[in-house]
Amino acid sequence: MDVIELNSIETYCRVFELPFTHPLVGVVECNEPEKLKPYMINWGFYALFLKDMASCTITYGKTRYDHGDKSIIAFAPGQVCAFEAIPGKDPKFVGVLFHPDFIHGTGLGRNILRYSFFAYSSNEALHLSPSEFRIIRNLIEIIGTELEMATDDHTHGIICDNIQLLFDYCVRFYDRQFSERHELNRDVLQRFENLL
């Protein structure tokens, strides 16, 4: 399996034949069939993808990443994972990519470690409701629009603030997802105890 060293956003855009606009931050969109055979990526930057449809299997080491339609997956610098396309399913996703240098010295840079969905131990995607999906999609579009505008003294701060807002919503939705699962598991345990 080929290993792709993605040390820059420019490299990502070149490998996946996507438009390149900024060396340290980008919004990407893919609606094209996967052209690569199974491959591994060594991430050199942060990446968060909003997937409309699960079109590949993702593996961290020997653990399969649990993801599906209408979900978010996230990767951090230094993480290595394998991707293999699912036949008949074309990728459909948008993503925010940013290099650690872009957030250095910002509130986001100081707080990035609190976003546990970037942790290697996190191998479960965030599964979104339709309204949550729209919120995340809108925030990614705002970041993309800001990147298309003429740069001024406010651009960097606005992009960082919107990425942080995006991540804060992800934390909120993760908390909801795991709270619901905890309640479901507690309910199953309660019914089991009642049967005894």
What residues fall within each predicted segment?
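Amphipathic, well-ordered alpha-helical segments in soluble domains
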Residues: 47, 135-142, 162, 166-169
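Amphipathic alpha-helix face/heptad-repeat signature
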Residues: 132, 139, 155, 159-162, ...
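Generic protein-terminus/edge-of-domain signal
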Residues: 1-59, 63-66
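A hydrophobic/aromatic-rich effector-binding and dimerization subdomain
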Residues: 84-148
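Histidine-centered metal-chelating micro-motifs
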Residues: 73, 77-83, 103-104
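Short beta-strand His + acidic residue motifs that chelate non-heme Fe in jelly-roll/DSBH
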Residues: 57-59, 81-88
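A cytosolic small-molecule/anion-sensing beta-strand core signal
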Residues: 52, 69, 77
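Short, Lys/Arg-enriched, Trp-marked, Pro/Gly-tolerant hinge/linker segments that flank
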Residues: 127, 150-158, 170-196
